[in-house]
Amino acid sequence: MKILYFDCSNGISGDMLLKAAADLSGHSDEIYEKINEAAEHGICGGSHHGHGDCCGGHGSHGADGHDHHDHGHHGHSRSYDEVKSIIAGSRFPEAAKAAAAAVYANIARAEAKVHGATLETVHFHEVGRDEAIINALATGMAVSYIETDEIRTSAIYDGKGTVVCSHGEISVPVPAVMALRENCSYDFRTADVNTEMVTPSGLAGLMGIGAEPVEPGQDLLAEAKTIKETEAKGGRDTGRPGLKAYILEK
């Protein structure tokens, strides 16, 4: 049995998830080519939707790193319906579209709860940008190439304290992450780190690709043979290593 395993003891962001999945897929060149194509010509192959530039290239195209996502309300926003339309009309494979749609369904529910909105009225700011949508699509594409029987995640560690956004300081875990936590069965823990380690798009990404928690007390790395491993860092310096990801054979 082939297992894709994410060790989230150092947190997770959307960029970290993309980097790790692309590296393990063995098709990183193709995936980043697709990212650059979408950034240059528009996600749907037409005009660029334009909410900030995509850098492309191996590593990160700047979709989220460990930024503050939708903690603030500023600049252009997109409705959930708009994002769904963009995903459906994109030139990514169907498996990538399905994963990205699941990611944004999770984010929409969380943001609606945080802001007292409905799925029809909720709007996205940072996570509604082209870069973030491309990130979700590319992650789905990468995971589809890995063709695993199971996707598993370790306990997920977030930091503590506060982070600063346009409205001032907010508590960590941030509100959207707290809302997402209510809709999954992952094991959440707190690290002795005074900043954000888990971003909404990182957690929603795990949920969107169908990752399940390991069984209590289970040590997959000891039980299974490691076929391939990688580590991916995000944009925020937490003083810890990055997201570790493995392809395991059991």
Regions found by a protein language model. Give the residues of each.
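N-terminal phosphate-binding or glycine-rich loops at protein starts, especially the Walker A/P-loop
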Residues: 1-40
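Conserved phosphate/anionic-ligand binding catalytic regions in large, soluble enzymes, centered on
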Residues: 6-20, 124-147
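Acidic, glycine-rich active-site loops and adjacent beta-strand->loop/helix elements
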Residues: 9-10, 38-39, 128-130, 155-163, ...
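Mobile "lid/hinge" segments at catalytic clefts and subdomain interfaces of large enzymes
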Residues: 28, 148-250
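Short beta-strand elements
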Residues: 33, 52, 62, 143, ...
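Histidine-centered metal-binding segments
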Residues: 37-82
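Anion-binding (especially nucleotide phosphate/pyrophosphate-binding) glycine-rich loop
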Residues: 78-123
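Flexible, glycine/proline-enriched loop segments at strand-loop-helix junctions
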Residues: 89-98, 123-130, 162-168, 189-197
